[in-house]
UniProtKB/Swiss-Prot annotation:
Organism per entry: Rickettsia massiliae (strain Mtu5)
Active site per UniProt: C119 (proton donor)
Protein name: UDP-N-acetylglucosamine 1-carboxyvinyltransferase
Pfam (any one): EPSP_synthase
Chain residues that bind phosphoenolpyruvate: K22, N23
Gene: murA
Length: 419
């Protein structure tokens, strides 16, 4: 099994190009079921993308892959969908597999999807996915670990209020609603840029969607959608991760290929800590200027601070001058990186969904183990900050969400290699 060897203590200097957004490309790939052909560009080279390709192929899709140096192009032909079951062996690898449920059900009137897997960071139940599809007229039962869904005729437009903001359920609802009979109005929706990107792709395919980027989305169902081409937006979570990497190594890095407005909340939080962050053409520049203040943080649905960046921010706060309180409001059990950071000398105490982080002068290298995707990269940031050697085990999590991570960091001066 591979591991990463990190010799820290080197300030990152240079530029990093941001890849396509994992959390946008996966639902867009699922949306290909709604039409006959979808051409997607700026696709990141990630194992989760490979898992979604395998899933779509299992349903009968034909996928042409055009490989470029920094991205894939995918041409997905879904004219011959002939299997409506998403098997456990594929779905267990990735929670995003549940996003084929809405498209299969709304287009073909039936779907059988295994209850999903993915990162071990809490229950993340599918209740809201099921509730909104039932509101559209679907019959759904959970049997033997599978969601069995069917409808008599087309799904019907509905008004539905999500009990809590759910990115995943918002996506499945939108994917189903675009082919319903009538109008659907969704309240308390997720507002994430990746949801906006999915909606923009669906509009390119001929969908009628209003209220994009707000908590109230109105969708007028169509009889069918068109073939289309679409470029996926850049990954704000990857961008934020490298912004924190520049800060924790006392570096100076240009993050390129990202719109500033979708990372502005990250930039503002960094500025609070004393890090210099300025917009540049097609990106943002992050510069350490000699101080790192303790700052409290709460994760919240967008435009709040992303839960997917909480672990990385915590790594930064372990070296701050003071005490910070980090509150995780999205997922339970998302502090699994804390014991590993403490092995490196961090002073962190967890109380429920809150972590009290007391800054220390320096972390020390250690052998550590990744528990999930975002936790693994937080340990890399911690390792980069030390003046010693860190060995990170179970790095397969990284390849689910970060393209060419070692290469991008090495090009900015990091001493990091996979063995």
């Amino acid at each position: 099994m591979h591991k990463l060897i990190i010799h820290g203590g080197k300030p990152l200097k240079g530029s990093i190009n941001i890849s396509g957004a994992k959390n946008a490309v996966l639902p867009i790939m699922a949306a290909s079921i709604l039409t006959d052909k979808l051409h997607i560009t700026n696709v990141p080279k990630l194992t989760d993308v490979g898992t979604m390709k395998d899933l779509l192929r299992s349903h009968g899709a034909d996928i042409e892959i055009i490989e470029h140096q920094d991205e894939f192009e995918l041409i997905i032909n879904t004219e011959n969908i002939n299997n409506f079951t998403a098997d456990y062996e594929i779905v267990r690898k990735m929670r995003a597999s549940i996003w084929v449920l809405g498209p299969l059900l709304t287009k073909y009137g039936k779907a059988k999807v295994s209850l999903p897997g993915g990162c071990a960071i809490g229950a993340r139940q599918v209740d809201l996915h099921i509730a909104v599809l039932k509101a559209m007229g679907a019959t759904i039962e959970i049997e033997d670990g599978y969601i069995n869904a069917s409808s008599k005729g087309r799904l019907k437009g509905t008004h539905f209020v999500f009990d809590k903001v759910s990115v995943g359920a918002t996506i499945n609802a939108i994917l189903a609603a675009v082919l319903t009979e009538g109008e659907t109005v969704l309240f308390n929706c997720g507002r994430e840029p990746e949801i906006v990107d999915l909606c923009n792709c669906l509009i390119t395919m001929g969908a009628d969607i209003a209220g994009i980027g707000t908590s109230e989305i109105t969708i007028k169902g169509k009889d069918s959608l068109n073939k289309a081409s679409y470029k996926v937006l850049s990954d704000r979570i990857e961008a934020g991760t490298y912004m924190f990497a520049a800060a924790i190594t006392k570096g100076d890095v240009k993050i390129c290929g990202i719109d500033y407005h979708i990372v502005e909340n990250i930039a503002l939080k960094l500025i609070e800590t004393g890090i210099k962050v300025v917009p540049i053409n097609n990106g943002v520049q992050v510069t350490y200027e000699g101080k790192l203040n303790s700052v409290d943080l709460e994760t919240n649905p967008y435009p709040g601070f992303a839960t997917d960046l909480q672990a990385q921010f915590m790594s930064l706060m372990t070296l701050s001058s003071g005490v910070s309180m980090i509150t995780e409001n999205i997922f339970e059990n998302r502090f699994m990186h804390v014991p590993e950071l403490c092995r490196m000398g961090a002073d962190i105490v967890v109380r429920g969904n809150k972590a009290v982080v007391r800054g220390v002068e320096m972390l020390k290298g250690a052998e550590v183990m990744a528990s999930d995707l975002r936790a693994s990269v937080s340990l890399i940031l911690a390792g980069l900050s030390t003046n010693s050697k860190t060995v990170l085990h179970r790095i397969y999590h990284l390849d689910r969400g970060f393209q060419d991570l070692e290469k991008k960091l090495s090009n900015c001066g990091a001493d990091i290699k996979r063995v």
